Amino acid sequence: MAEPQQQLVDIDPDFEPLSRPRSCTWPLHRPEFSEQPGNSNTSSPAPSVKPEQGIVDFINSLSLLEETEDYPDEKPVLLNDFHCQDNCAHPQQQHPQQPNPQLTHPQQVPPLPAPASGSSPAAAQRKSSSSRRNAWGNMSYADLITKAIESSPEKRLTLSQIYEWMVKSVPYFKDKGDSNSSAGWKNSIRHNLSLHSRFVRVQNEGTGKSSWWMLNPEGGKSGKSPRRRATSMDNNSKFTKSRGRAAKKKMSLQGGLDGGSNSPGSQYPKWLGSPNSHSNDDFEPWGNFRTRASSDASTLSGRRSPFLPEEDEAAEVHIGYPGTKLGGPLPSLSEVAGHHGSENMMDNLLENLNLISPKNNTQGSQEAQTALSSPLMQGSPGYPSYTSPNMGPQPQVQQDYRKCLYGQGGVGGLNPISIPTLSDSKPGGYGPFVGQYNCAPGLLKELLTADADPRGELMQSGEGQPVLPSYASQGQMAQGGKMITHPHLHAHPRSLHQLPSPAMGLNGCAMLPHGHPVRLSSMKPQPHLPHHTHLGRGGGEAGMPSYTNGNGFHRHGAIAHHHHSHPERLPSDLDDMLIDQLDVECDVERVLHDTLMDGDALDFNFDPMSSQQSFTHSVKTSTHNWVSG
């Protein structure tokens, strides 16, 4: 240590390090110097430096500040101003209160001790002075309130009277009685009255008066009671008890649900994402909510969905019975394919899409009648015939719905696909009312290869000669009427004897009736001259004129059948199965709706071909309206 001290001295002998108490710390540091051998157990800030005597006296005076600031008899040289104010206040305070002098000043502090013996008296004085110190003295707010209540003759005071006593009796509060400066200490008095158990609040007998504050006759605690904290979920005993009861209830419910797992609620704890699966009881309030995040398909219960089951959409009105609805939902394509498998269904579709070429031209008209009288293409047999209600009994009433799949020109025939729900849901079946749009075998190939509008393609018979379809409503099956001529019809000179297909349009308009052939005979042998066509019909409704042009389209003149007022469309899943799966660019609804229903805006023009055996018709729509005569 000699070398560092020598170096410091050699550097600058005039600036020696001085030991001083650290600022901004509490309690104040009391240094012990190295020349005192009796107090060597305490460390010194700079033991190698010998301070001056004046500095030592100043430091010792500061170290005794906390023990000597409240006592009037102590008059250190450096603290005269501070103790002068204190001396002026204490005599005035002691007079009204009349306290015991020995209690206020238990012992007299001797004058400033010598530096050698200053530490031991200071430590003893610090241990003895353990009471709380305030600006008005050694008494707390509770002590002052107690003295104020004891000084009253009735041993009780109101809050305003306690304020008055504080201003009059305690010198520190004499100049703090106004409203601006009294807010702080009055608030402290109210807090002490409420927090301490030694004070009791008694209701005042008079009306509109504040309550009395009295001392607790049982004595109460001398100190402060524990502070009342705001209740929370952590320290609230009521919440703890309720949480314990909820945990017990949860355990009992889980035990009961394990025995009977058939109930829908038993699935909740077994789901890992359920709030009930957590072991922490803090999640217990979430158990009352329904689990929206879980999937209904992954659970055994079908009643866990948070959404109410929506009502099924209104079924399509049956074309045979206006206003009636389907008894059950239509099966989807996935359900239909589930019975036979998707591969089998696609095989059936491909088999029925065979592009059958027209038959040999040398075949007779009888074969053409046979081909036309067959329900659909040869790849899909088993379709029953349809008979008009005006012509006799129906051959088959209990008809499966799959047998009534329509054959639209561009879709072709379909193999009967099992749709069990449709035949089981309605006793009468749908066969007599949902007909089939018959087409000859060569039409599908023609539609797939031609560039013309698919609505303009007409059917060809197996003989290669055109089959001109006749459209008539169900009420026109057996009626007679006059015919009108079409000046632009060019037909082959030979007569076409056709046995029409027993089918019915999807919009309620039946096609050619069974057993009533339409004879298209040319009035003149020239192939390109206008001629009259006659529709051979049996007896039927009289006075119901029907108008037809040369191509065989029939319309009511005055009265439209009730089926016309109920346009129908196929079920959505059948549309998907027949159109989307086959990938044929043909809008079924548009063809049926525009072509068969909007008859007033149709005009058909036929362009002749040079071929004498077979020719193709192109149907062109125009805005020309029919004028009924």
Curated annotation (Swiss-Prot):
PROSITE patterns: FORK_HEAD_2 (PS00658), FORK_HEAD_3 (PS50039). InterPro entries: FH_FOXO1 (IPR047408), Fork_head_dom (IPR001766), FOXO-TAD (IPR032067), FOXO_KIX-bd (IPR032068), TF_fork_head_CS_2 (IPR030456), WH-like_DNA-bd_sf (IPR036388), WH_DNA-bd_sf (IPR036390). GO terms for cellular component: cytoplasm; nucleus. The keyword Cytoplasm applies. Residues 90-107, 115-133 have a biased composition (Low complexity). It is found in: Cytoplasm; Nucleus. It comes from the Eukaryota. Residues 36-46, 291-302, 359-377, 385-397 have a biased composition (Polar residues). The lineage of its organism: Eukaryota, Metazoa, Chordata, Craniata, Vertebrata. Pfam families: Forkhead, FOXO-TAD, FOXO_KIX_bdg. The keyword Cytoplasm applies. Transcription factor that regulates metabolic homeostasis in response to oxidative stress. Binds to the consensus sequence 5'-TT[G/A]TTTTG-3' and the related Daf-16 family binding element (DBE) with consensus sequence 5'-TT[G/A]TTTAC-3'. Main regulator of redox balance and osteoblast numbers and controls bone mass. Orchestrates the endocrine function of the skeleton in regulating glucose metabolism. May act as a positive regulator of apoptosis in cardiac smooth muscle cells as a result of its transcriptional activation of pro-apoptotic genes. GO terms for molecular function: DNA-binding transcription factor activity, RNA polymerase II-specific; RNA polymerase II cis-regulatory region sequence-specific DNA binding. The gene is foxo1b. This is Forkhead box protein O1-B. Residues 1-54, 88-134, 211-308, 359-397 are annotated as: Disordered. Signal peptide: none annotated.
